[in-house]
A protein has these predicted regions:
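Hydrophobic anchor at the beta1->P-loop junction of P-loop NTPases
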Residues: 8
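Glycine-rich phosphate-binding loop used to anchor ATP phosphates in small-molecule kinases
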Residues: 70-123
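Conserved phosphate-donor/acceptor-positioning beta-strand/loop module used by diverse small-molecule
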Residues: 123-146
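Small-molecule kinase domains that catalyze NTP-dependent phosphoryl transfer to phosphate-bearing small molecules
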Residues: 148-203, 215-226
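Walker A/P-loop
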Residues: 17
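ATP-binding Walker
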Residues: 14
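P-loop (Walker A) phosphate-binding loop of NTP-binding proteins
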Residues: 11
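Conserved substrate/cofactor phosphate-moiety recognition/catalytic segment
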Residues: 21-83
């Protein structure tokens, strides 16, 4: 029997990582925990990430408007980035096919085609898609209050890595919001400025009890296989 997959979608500051962690902590049954933050920080080699010297081969931040090189940035995938993201999605599928429940947080934009790739790679498996979407202003306030506390591989990224990362993320933020929330198909959408983490977990649990999610099936009707 396939394990249940829960995908928690939302941009930085939406509460997706906190929700995923609290959901697993609240359960007596067996749930694996993974997500885009784990993947980017601990699985993808730093030199191929969007702050690294070989980002063009992996996941690169490039100008949204080539005529404005100092403006908003967006993500672009190189060959290793495409292969890595496909693997990330296949891992979720492998967990389910082995009978494990898994909850993971994600940034489900359609360009690059994270949304389409995941929807098709998880075809035939039970997936519940949850989108956490607080207002833009709330997100910006939350992100502004965050401190850079991650241990950075300065031997790869350089001694001024923290400053460069903060600057790059600031320039990605507007694009992330538009790209991640462009898709309106979801099994459950929650405003985390209104509902706290415990309430969000309870709402996800209640939706699970209602039956299987249908959002990914709907997405496969909208988006061709990438």
């Amino acid at each position: 029997m396939s394990g249940q997959i829960i995908v928690i979608n939302g941009t930085s500051g939406s509460g997706k990582s906190t929700t995923a962690e609290k959901f697993v902590q609240s359960r007596e049954d067996f749930w694996l925990l993974y997500g885009i933050d784990h993947f980017m920080a601990g699985t993808l080699p730093a030199r191929f990430g969007h702050h690294g010297p070989r980002a063009a081969e992996g996941i690169q931040a490039v100008p949204l408007d080539p005529a404005d090189p100092e403006g908003t940035l967006k993500w672009r995938l190189g060959p290793q980035g495409k292969a890595a993201m496909a693997t990330f999605h296949d891992w979720a599928g492998a967990a389910s096919r082995n009978g494990c429940n898994i909850v993971l947080d994600h940034l489900l934009m359609s360009d690059p085609p994270f949304l389409q790739d995941m929807a098709w790679r998880l075809e035939g498996l039970p997936v519940l898609l949850v989108t956490l979407k607080p207002p833009y202003e709330v997100l910006m306030e939350r992100v502004a209050q965050r401190a850079m506390t991650k241990k950075l591989p300065v031997e790869v990224l350089g001694e001024d890595a923290a400053r460069k990362i903060v600057e790059r993320l600031d320039r990605l933020r507007d694009w992330f919001y538009g790209a991640v929330y462009a898709n309106t198909i979801s099994d459950l959408t929650i405003d985390t400025s209104v509902h706290g983490p415990d309430d969000v977990v309870a709402m996800i649990d209640a939706r699970l009890r209602q039956g299987p999610g249908t959002a990914f099936e709907e997405l496969r009707k909208v988006w061709p296989r990438p």
